[in-house]
Swiss-Prot record:
<dbReference type="GO" id="GO:0004357">
    <property type="term" value="F:glutamate-cysteine ligase activity"/>
</dbReference>
<keyword id="KW-0436">Ligase</keyword>
<comment type="function">
    <text>ATP-dependent carboxylate-amine ligase which exhibits weak glutamate--cysteine ligase activity.</text>
</comment>
<dbReference type="InterPro" id="IPR006336">
    <property type="entry name" value="GCS2"/>
</dbReference>
<dbReference type="Pfam" id="PF04107">
    <property type="entry name" value="GCS2"/>
</dbReference>
<dbReference type="GO" id="GO:0005524">
    <property type="term" value="F:ATP binding"/>
</dbReference>
<comment type="similarity">
    <text>Belongs to the glutamate--cysteine ligase type 2 family. YbdK subfamily.</text>
</comment>
<keyword id="KW-0067">ATP-binding</keyword>
<protein>
    <recommendedName>
        <fullName>Putative glutamate--cysteine ligase 2-2</fullName>
        <ecNumber>6.3.2.2</ecNumber>
    </recommendedName>
</protein>
<dbReference type="InterPro" id="IPR011793">
    <property type="entry name" value="YbdK"/>
</dbReference>
<dbReference type="GO" id="GO:0042398">
    <property type="term" value="P:modified amino acid biosynthetic process"/>
</dbReference>
<keyword id="KW-0547">Nucleotide-binding</keyword>
<dbReference type="InterPro" id="IPR014746">
    <property type="entry name" value="Gln_synth/guanido_kin_cat_dom"/>
</dbReference>
<dbReference type="InterPro" id="IPR050141">
    <property type="entry name" value="GCL_type2/YbdK_subfam"/>
</dbReference>
Length: 383
């Protein structure tokens, strides 16, 4: 089948931020997304689009709302867009006694008790995936970056895969699941890949090979729409982007900006390499798979595989080197401050580390963990 890629202005940006809705007193998940979205639409009738705010959307579960930016030139623009949408949500949730937070999962609310949004595509997903599908109490951050030519898409995607463990370690924020300590920095990473077509992307030499794969998925009934290919990094042909979907939910706007800047800078660097006639190294799938597991298990303490030769390094050390290398790219893109925030995450610890510290300080009380995440979203990561 033919998949037309609609080129975008190179390195333009879009960000999606999935937020959990919780009881402001108990920290438990509350399934009030429909009420929240109705309230937002009523407060902003001039923005309604099919009875829905164009930047505040439903998700799989009724305990979730998703903030979606427009097309942005800079990370600063994206952060401002998300901040406006978050304020619109709070206009409704504050009087309801509902708080919002973001992490890769909810530390203690039971997954199987969470109602699903009443949409046909979600009903089909749950019908097909059953127990695994009903476990998806997970939240993430997705970053779209515009690509100006179809032939760049797959090489850039492969390049981003090399940085999978970097994104996973920085964002890891789901050490708890249904009240239990999992021993993993990111339970979400291993949970989400249980869905059909989710997980690591395949490597394709040509766009035609990718088209052939998608055709096979349609022919065999695996998918009914291209959007049902839920890879951790994927092309989005109709938008003209690559979508980086690796990350666990991020607790603060500062951290969202850091991840967006790292994504934008890497994509822009890869694009420039290709424009200059260069190539982007890839790693064997077995190294990529191992890197994903290591980052999910060990987070910021992961020793990651760097290349096809099997060289290894502590992920935080390689992150610091990567940020230094990308500083000229960030200056060009206007995101130097946000890229530097990657180093702040390394210094203060990723969310999973902060959650464990809070739990230890409160004798294992996971309600305290949720309330701390709530305050971080309101006041920043140093709250």
């Amino acid at each position: 089948m033919q998949i037309d890629f609609a080129p975008s202005r190179q390195s333009t940006l879009g960000v999606e931020w999935e937020l959990a809705l919780v009881n402001a007193r108990t920290g438990e998940l509350v399934s009030v997304a429909n009420d929240v979205l109705k309230g937002v639409a009523a407060n902003h009738p001039d923005l309604n689009e099919d009875d829905e705010h164009p930047h505040i959307k439903r998700e799989l579960l009724l305990n979730t709302v998703e903030l979606v930016t427009g097309i942005c030139e800079t990370v600063k623009d994206a952060k401002e867009d998300l901040s406006r949408s978050l304020a619109a949500v709070r206009e409704v949730t504050d009087p309801m006694g509902v708080e919002v937070f973001c992490a890769g999962s909810h530390p203690f609310s039971p997954p199987l008790l969470q109602p699903v949004t009443d949409k046909e595509r979600y009903a089909k997903l749950i019908e097909r995936t059953q127990w695994w599908g009903r476990q998806m109490v997970i939240y993430g951050v997705h970053v779209h970056v515009g690509i100006d030519h179809r032939d760049k898409v797959l090489p850039i995607l492969d390049g981003l895969v090399n940085y999978f463990p970097h994104f996973q370690a920085l964002s890891a924020s789901s050490p708890y699941w249904a009240g239990e300590e999992t021993g993993y920095a990111s339970q979400r990473a291993l949970m989400f890949q249980q869905l059909p077509t989710a997980g690591l992307p395949f490597q394709f030499e040509t766009w035609e090979a990718y088209e052939s794969y998608v055709q096979d998925m349609f022919t065999t009934g695996v998918i009914d729409a291209t959007s049902e290919i839920r890879w951790d990094i994927r092309p989005v042909a109709n938008l003209g982007t690559i979508e980086m979907r690796i990350c666990d939910g991020l607790a603060t706007l500062e951290e969202v900006g850091a991840i967006a800047a790292l994504t934008q800078c890497l994509v822009d660097e890869f694009s420039s390499i290709l424009d200059a006639g260069g190539s982007i190294p890839t790693m064997p799938p077995w190294h990529v798979q191992e890197n994903k597991w290591r980052a999910a298990r060990y987070g910021m303490e992961a020793i990651i595989i760097l290349d096809a030769e099997g060289n290894e390094q502590l992920v935080t050390e390689h992150l610091a080197e990567t940020v230094s290398r990308l500083e000229p790219v960030a200056a060009k893109l206007g995101c130097s401050e946000e890229l530097a925030d990657v180093l702040k995450i390394i210094q203060r610890g990723a969310s999973y580390q902060r959650q464990r510290r809070v739990a230890a300080e409160h004798n294992g009380d996971l309600q305290a963990v949720v309330m701390d995440l709530v305050q971080q979203m309101r006041k920043g990561p140093d709250a």
